[in-house]
Amino acid sequence: MDDDEDWIALSDPDISMAELDAVTNVLKSARISAGEVVDTFENDFAEYLGRRYAVAVSSATQGLMLALRALGIRPGDEIITSAYAWYQIAHAITLVGAVPVLVDIDYWSGALLTDKAAAKITPNTRAILAGNPNGHPADWNALRALASRHGLVLLEDSTEAIGSRYQGKLVGTFGDMSVFDFSQPAALVCGEGGMVVTDDPVLASELRYFRGRVMDERFSISIASRVPHQAMMSDMSAALGLAQLERLDEILARRKRVESWYLAYIQSFEGIKPAYIAPEVDEIHWMTFLVHLGTRFTRSARNQIVDDLLTAHIEAPAYCNPLHLQYFYGSLGYRKGDLPVTEKVADRALALPFHGHLDEDTVAFIVQTAKDSSVNVGAGAAIY
């Protein structure tokens, strides 16, 4: 379906000749695996955020796994996090043997609620992992105060929010370690890859150790007492990411223009929850254009709208399937009804196409198609 010229994709990377030239130069070089281009990408990304260290990795999942290992997280340790999250990130908790403790979210922002997290702290709790859902920053001051009060590590999932700002500071600057993802539908992409940032030199050293050996060390047969991963980013991916980083302001500005069209056309869409921006948030760069339907819409009505959009060749998936309702996490004892706000939000959310290649006519068509479908499902007026 992606090859259909009439298909309107959820995401479409903003690639210019700068990216093509950067990758071509690496392909013409003697090294395409991890090397100097990765080093440059790390340095420039750390400078962009104002953080001391950045460690490039093969994916955000691997990045969080390395972060947890760098902290010495062991089987049985508890990590408090949200079920309304990019599931690849939360999976990292399970993959290192730790226990994900899922808590409910704020109805308007989708962010992890500090008081809900506080109620789940036990002697086994080691860290809080909070995200910036779909680009909206969490309440980082409250989360930092909670973590400090209980001696916990604060980890930041910034996979959905590059460029967003909370009280004047960029996301990615609030966690003891913060994780970014550079795969679609993110604004900055490098195919597949991620970045972990920190200001702690010990944690940075541990991240690099657990990430695995660089090219010059791969011929050594020595094995240390702790076995590392092999989670390096290649110079090819780093070249693409570096070129994207240099154009990030331009990329985000294009997406803001598309957002303005959506906001204009969505005004006449009866029955949706308006986009929310918390008072302490200065700037938001959405990962997708997320539509929150009112409570008169059922989950099945939302799914019918998704199907109608698909029939019209519009990629607009449900957003999202909460972790506690997925089979594996059910085996940990979670059940439907445990996180009522998460379920209420997730049952009525869908993500509309959002990228810089959309024009105003296409946005108008997407919104009108969704509106027509909402009328057909007979949901009636909005109740939030």
Predicted regions and their residues:
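Phosphate-binding glycine-rich loop
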Residues: 31-78, 92-96, 102-104, 169
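PLP-dependent aminotransferase class I/II
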Residues: 39-43, 51-54, 115, 127-131, ...
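Helix C-cap/helix->beta junction micro-motif
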Residues: 96, 149-150, 269, 312
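Short beta-strand->loop structural element characteristic of the AMP-binding/adenylate-forming
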Residues: 99-109, 317
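Active-site phosphate-binding strand-loop segment of PLP-dependent enzymes
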Residues: 108-190, 195-197, 202, 351
